[in-house]
Each structure stands twice: as C-alpha cells, then as structure tokens.
C-alpha cells in the first residue's frame, strides 16, 4: 500500500494558503487491511477511514460510475488495483487533482500545477457533468480564489451551463445547496459565487428570487448602475469588505428582493419594496433551509433599510419604535449588523464605493443615549404596569430628540 496527500491540502500549499484539512488516498490496500491496521471506517457509500492517532481522513483509491440522478447517484469501485491516476481522474478540477507522496514528490497527471500558475479553474474530464454539485463547488472556488486572480476556463463554464440546462440541479437537496452557499458567503468575494451561477444559467434554478432582479431598473439619479441585479452583487461585495459576518452578507444579498415584484409601469421606482420582499425572503429561507439567525436579520434589513437611510428625517418616537421592533435593547449587535448592511447598500452603487455613512454613527449614539435612560426613576415616580413602558418610551424619545436638535445645529454651524 502507498499513501498520498491529495486535494485541497496540496493545492493550498502550492498557493501558499493556509492548509485547514488534510485528506489522504491509499493505493493498493483493502478495507480488511485498513481495519487490521487500526483505522476506523466512517464512510458508508465508499471506504473512508480515520487514522487511529491523528483522526485525519484516509480513503481507498476508487473509481466512480454514474448510476442515477444528482450527486449521490454513483457506484464506487475501491479494489486494490485502482491506480492513483484513476482516483485523481474522478476529481472535479485539475487544481484539486494533484497528489503528494511521503517524500514530497508530486503526481500531477492532469496539469493542475500549470493551471495553478495560470490561475485557471479547469475540469479534469468530461465526467465533470455527471455531478451537478460541481456547479456550486466551482462557483465557490471562483469566489474563494477571486482575489488571487483565478478565473473559470470557458470550456468548464460551458459544461456548468450544460448541467444547469439538463435538469440535474433539481436533484440537489436543499441542505446541500445551502451548505455550498454558506461556504461561499465566508469567502473573500462571495458576490463572485452568485455572478458565476448567473453566467452559467444556474442562478435561475437555484436562487430564482435573486435572478429575478436582473433586468429590473432603478432610478439612475440614485443608482448609476441602474440594474437591480448588478446593484445587489455590488452591495454584497461592499458589505463583505465591511464585515465577514455571514448573516450580514446574506441579508445584503436579499435586501432588495421586493424590487422584482414592482409592476413594470411603476419602474424605475420601487415603492414599499422592503415590505414586499418579506414574504419572498421567508419563502427562499424555508426552501433552502437557511438558519433562523440569517433569516431574521434578512427580514429586518429588508423591512428597515429605507428607514435607516432616512435616519436624519425620522422623528425621535419613530427611532424608539425602530429600536423596539428590532429587539435591540436585548440584542444590540443586531443594530450594528443592520447598519453594516445599510452602509454596504449605500456603497453598492457605481461611484459610491468609498462613501461614509453618518447615519450609522448617528443611530448608534441615539441608541446609546436611549439605553442609558433610567427605568428605576420612572418606577420611583409612581408609574405602574404598562405605564412604566409608556413613560420609558417617552423619556427615550425625549433624550433622542434633544440629541437630534444638537446634532442638526452642529452640522449647520459647519
């Protein structure tokens, strides 16, 4: 038997990126031999083992043959005669089909090193089209390595388009679609993930609510980029520069879904789009099993982003109600997350990429002042039951209003 380090660990070492997981392939062995050596078998569909000491994954070299639909419709052959090259042949991209032996010698039958140097994501073989999950994986790699200059080979993008048009994507489970999306949201350039899906015609299948935004115009005065789909990807890009919080990034992606519902005769204006988008977001999140934490922030951002943009025009009472509705007294981080999305929304427009967002500082100070209003003095003054909350809201609004007057006066002086 011979053991090789394969896949991401080899690729990331060559890219001088941090290696997170190490996966090994074992050539010329069997299930019986691995168990006899103390390895623990964990793979049900194909023989994968955990090392008795390191707990790292070791898989027997195998070939795969498509037997059904989706990414699970495969039969595997892991007999002793399967070669290293045969195992590498079943992998998705050439950059993931490089192996390294115990002496550091590389085996690269499909020229993955050349593609790493050329910064190209290229499929290993035409068997690429047998696994629809690869559309999402390649889009995710494009997002992950975009900052390094990687692009997808045109012929690979064509195969991804073929998969999207074949109906195979319909066989992906919602959980797996979300898993890949969630990983993409943690990448350095998550907007590239959705851009690639749009290019290969997979976005309309997997995320039709986002795809519907493309071709919907906005007022050029406020949106020089005009197209709502383009704006959405710009917002995701800018928000990702401001925060690595995946829930914040997801909320940025879906904040304008309501604009797709605007009747054409009302274009390019989109009255009430934030509220119109709420049922669309709920439906999307239910379909692909988005975590509640992500969903709740997304709903808040869609519902309130116009109010946040208009913060300086809001009455103090309205600001207190906004803080109540967002449950910010118990979850102050939610206000920060909402403001990050809104800042990204402002910057996600052609020519506004460096813009500051004074609304955030203003509302955070309003919140700080309102949080410090003393409820004990209200109780001591004799208020009881529901009167306490009503008076607390009045006192908070008064405190915010006093600050608002000072803020406006200070700006007028400058």
Swiss-Prot record:
Catalysed reaction, written as an equation: a tRNA precursor + 2 CTP + ATP = a tRNA with a 3' CCA end + 3 diphosphate; a tRNA with a 3' CCA end + 2 CTP + ATP = a tRNA with a 3' CCACCA end + 3 diphosphate
| Chain coiled-coil ranges | none
Instruction: Select a single GO molecular function from the record's annotations and give it.
Output: ATP binding
UniProt keywords (A-Z) are: ATP-binding, Hydrolase, Magnesium, Metal-binding, Multifunctional enzyme, Nickel, Nucleotide-binding, Nucleotidyltransferase, RNA repair, RNA-binding, Transferase, tRNA processing
Q: Quote the record's binding site residues for CTP.
A: 8, 11, 91, 137, 140
Q: What's an example Gene Ontology biological process for this entry?
A: tRNA 3'-terminal CCA addition
What CDD domains does the entry give? HDc, NT_ClassII-CCAase
Binding-site list for ATP:
8, 11, 91, 137, 140
Q: Where does Mg(2+) bind?
A: 21, 23
Entry EC number(s): 2.7.7.72, 3.1.3.-, 3.1.4.-
Q: Write down the InterPro entries for this protein, in alphabetical order.
A: CCA_bact (IPR012006), HD/PDEase_dom (IPR003607), HD_domain (IPR006674), NT_sf (IPR043519), PolA_pol_head_dom (IPR002646), PolyA_RNA-bd (IPR032828), tRNA_CCA-adding_enzyme (IPR050124)
Which positions fall inside the HD domain? 228-329
* Cofactors (names): Mg(2+); Ni(2+)
How many cofactors are bound and how? Magnesium is required for nucleotidyltransferase activity.
How does the record describe its quaternary structure?
Monomer. Can also form homodimers and oligomers.
Family (UniProt):
Belongs to the tRNA nucleotidyltransferase/poly(A) polymerase family. Bacterial CCA-adding enzyme type 1 subfamily.
Function, as annotated: Catalyzes the addition and repair of the essential 3'-terminal CCA sequence in tRNAs without using a nucleic acid template. Adds these three nucleotides in the order of C, C, and A to the tRNA nucleotide-73, using CTP and ATP as substrates and producing inorganic pyrophosphate. tRNA 3'-terminal CCA addition is required both for tRNA processing and repair. Also involved in tRNA surveillance by mediating tandem CCA addition to generate a CCACCA at the 3' terminus of unstable tRNAs. While stable tRNAs receive only 3'-terminal CCA, unstable tRNAs are marked with CCACCA and rapidly degraded.
Instruction: Read off the domain note.
Output: Comprises two domains: an N-terminal domain containing the nucleotidyltransferase activity and a C-terminal HD domain associated with both phosphodiesterase and phosphatase activities.
Query: What miscellaneous comment appears in this entry?
Result: A single active site specifically recognizes both ATP and CTP and is responsible for their addition.
Task: Identify this protein by name.
Answer: Multifunctional CCA protein
* Name of encoding gene: cca
